[in-house]
Amino acid sequence: SDAIEVTIPSFEGEMGILKDHIPLITFLRPGIISIKNQDEKNFFAEEGTVEFSNNNLLILSSTVKDLKNFDKNSISGALKDAEKKLQETNLSDKEQYITSYKINSLKEISQ
């Protein structure tokens, strides 16, 4: 069935997309994608691209995990990897920014 609303984490902030939303292309930052229809499904996504046009939503991301299948050990491992990456001295500002968002999102999920 069609989604009533999809909320995505974009670099502009949390963005809610409803039917007949204006066309858009934006960049996805690490965070929670929420899809609402009769129930609600939540996914953790890493960076990517979002396009909405003619009531079709396309999300391209290297990693998307269903939160109901994302166990504490997986979250903990991903969090440790991200924190370790943030300690690297050769990261670009963009990589630091994205990794920080990833860490914050993973901490939010783990609670």
Protein language model annotation of sequence segments:
Residues 1-81:
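Compact, glycine-rich, soluble single-domain proteins
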Residues 65-111:
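Acidic/glycine-rich phosphate/pyrophosphate-binding loops and surrounding catalytic core
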